Amino acid sequence: MALRPGREGGESSAALATAQARFSRGEFAEARELYSAFIGQCARHGSKCSPEDLATAYNNRGQTKYFSVDFYEAMDDYTSAIEILPSFEVPYYNRGLIRYRLGYFDEALEDFKKALDLNPGFQDAVLSLKQTILDKEEKQRRNAEKSY
């Protein structure tokens, strides 16, 4: 799940908006480059990037990596977004989806629960949490059957 940039920041926000426009058109390689440039720009000393915009850039760059099946790199970006803005529920959800796909059910559950702590009305996280619980129980049942 990608997000649109915040409303602050003038020029830097415009750069982020350009990246988002590319993302929205499905131009993921171009969007990734623009998000990376924005992140680099924010890293410069004296930058006035807002935490919201920087976290959004990391989250959305993570989405481009997810679409390229670069799961571990995507998780790194989601984690960076979380570190910058711990109250941002979307990267918890996105990281949880990857952890779920990789079979890391306990870690996925933690991420989905955190996303829901931050936003109880986040329906995609509700559904993902329920599915993860079901699949974890099914995996445990299969493993128990193999033990007999």
From Swiss-Prot:
It comes from Mus musculus. The gene is Ttc32. The keyword RNA-binding does not apply. InterPro entries: TPR-like_helical_dom_sf, TPR_2, TPR_rpt. It comes from the Eukaryota. The keyword Secreted does not apply. This is Tetratricopeptide repeat protein 32. It holds the Pfam family TPR_2. PANTHER family: TETRATRICOPEPTIDE REPEAT PROTEIN 32. TPR repeats lie at residues 12-45, 55-88, 89-122. Keywords: Repeat, TPR repeat.
